């Protein structure tokens, strides 16, 4: 893995690949809204670099290559935004109104036309 992560206090214990936003009762919480501009990152699996390593909390990938939970079809190079499915991302569809440009947080590294919830490799921007 090749990501840069930092620990943040979370309001629950989230598994790696979960998309999180700033908010909730602690510093971060699971995303549940499409194109949420509060996106913080993705819960990291094994960060290459971990900031605030002595702090409690979950490692949130801020940059680099990580597995990300997604729903819907994605193509290599697609921009990813938060989805309405809690903790998951989806591909940004260019023709769809999506709110803030600040809601884009990653790019897909794979072509995957599955529609079931799953993990894919992506680069956090």
Model-assigned labels for residue ranges:
Residues 1-125:
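Extracellular receptor-binding modules and their adjoining Ser/Thr/Gly/Asp/Asn-rich linkers
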């Amino acid at each position: 893995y090749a990501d840069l992560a930092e620990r943040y206090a979370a309001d629950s214990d989230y598994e790696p690949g979960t998309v999180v936003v700033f908010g909730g009762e602690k510093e971060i919480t699971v995303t549940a809204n499409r194109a949420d501009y509060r996106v913080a990152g993705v819960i990291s699996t094994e960060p290459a670099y971990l900031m605030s390593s002595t702090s409690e909390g979950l490692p949130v990938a801020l940059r680099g290559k990580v597995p990300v939970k997604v729903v819907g079809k994605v193509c290599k190079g697609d921009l990813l935004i938060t989805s309405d499915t809690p903790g998951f991302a989806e591909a940004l569809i260019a023709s769809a109104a999506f709110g803030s440009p600040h809601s884009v947080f990653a790019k897909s590294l794979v072509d995957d036309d599955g529609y079931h919830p799953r993990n894919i490799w992506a680069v956090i921007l």
